Amino acid sequence: WQSTATRMMGGEAEPTATPEDGDRRFKDASWSDNDVFDYIKQSYLLTSRWLQSTVADVEGLDDKSAGKVDFHTRRFVEALSPSNFVPTNPVVLKETAETGGQNLLNGLKNLLQDLDKNTGRLNIRMTDEDAFEIGKNVAVSPGKVVFRNDLMELIQFDPSTETVARRPLLIMPPWINKYYIFDLRKENSFIQWAVGQGHTVFVISWVNPDARLTEKTLDDYMLEGPLAALGAIEKATGEAKINAIGYCIGGTLLACTLAYMAARKDERIPSATFFTTMIDFEDAGELAVFIDEQQLSALEARMDKLGYLEGAEMASTFNMMRGNDLIWSFVINNYLLGKDPFPFDLLYWNSDATRMPATMHSFYLRKMYLENKLIEPGGITLDGVALDLRKIKVPCYLIST
């Protein structure tokens, strides 16, 4: 308050607290130029940092409990940001004055539109979903389905070059979202780039399961996913050796598949690439906050009723880890400013989440996240084969950015 008083009397004073680099909540000049809002901003930053440091200094907590306390304290602090409230956000106040409050009426309409009429769940729109259409301006690379079963369709994309690589390329996306993360727009499509390099690309497009697939296991995802794809690719191309890429949980499945194939002396995948893949779950980052026996049991009870985990529930978990960017920025834009979200292909894909079969997902969370069994030789058994990652001898490239 002393620095604010000095500024209000015409003096110069350095701010006591400033936002961290990358914090876009206070980017508008009003947060610094207006003495009142600068005071509100600095008071919030000082208080939130004090609260977080106080909680961090609590004694007697194990690392896991301390991580949970820190995580939820930060979510609490984010929710109380002055940028999230009409009276303390100068940008919203200006918009309200200029529009005569029309922004708040528009925001209420947006809020009602985002509320699920059946469940009451709030699904905050992150992008203009009407601006995108599968096959028109996202997932536009020309391909054909060459194989399908209960869990996936296999899509083939032919190379666009005169010289063609002999080995086909199999891409295994995660099944928590759709495959077209690899094929958003032509300018940022990995598939477009790969076929332009002479690769014959095959991509697994996972099914969005319902209760009929509740008993599907991780064994089934391996057998009916990559292993079924290998046979279909050989039938389509005549090539038995196939390079593979796994992304996120698709990469975890690729690691399981390679260990399974190594045990059976199956050499059809001579090289593997992993994009942002967890194999050792010892340090699962902030996701570990949601993994303990009590929370898993509650999750399993919810899944047992439906036969699957709703995609929106998984998406909400990931959004919480970046609350300012993936929750509160859209609350401000959609509900306080009354604006429609901006068209953004990546956020359209991010919102297009899929369900997960209860049996498979329970096994995955317990064996990977809770028990970290994948790194133990024989810790996980799929299709009767005890997996040992040490037996994987194929060249592997891993990228985690």
Question: Which residue ranges define each predicted feature?
Answer:
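Alpha/beta-hydrolase-fold enzymes
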Residues: 62-94, 235, 239, 257-361, ...
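Short beta-strand immediately N-terminal to the catalytic nucleophile in serine-hydrolase-like folds
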Residues: 244-246, 275, 399
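Short beta-strand element of the alpha/beta-hydrolase
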Residues: 164-175
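Short amphipathic alpha-helix adjacent to the substrate-entry channel of hydrolases
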Residues: 183-201
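Alpha/beta-hydrolase active-site loop
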Residues: 213-237
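Amphipathic, low-complexity, repeat-rich surface-exposed segments
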Residues: 1-152, 164-165, 202, 309
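Alpha/beta-hydrolase fold nucleophile elbow
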Residues: 230-250
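Short beta-strand/loop motif that positions the catalytic acidic residue
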Residues: 392, 398-400
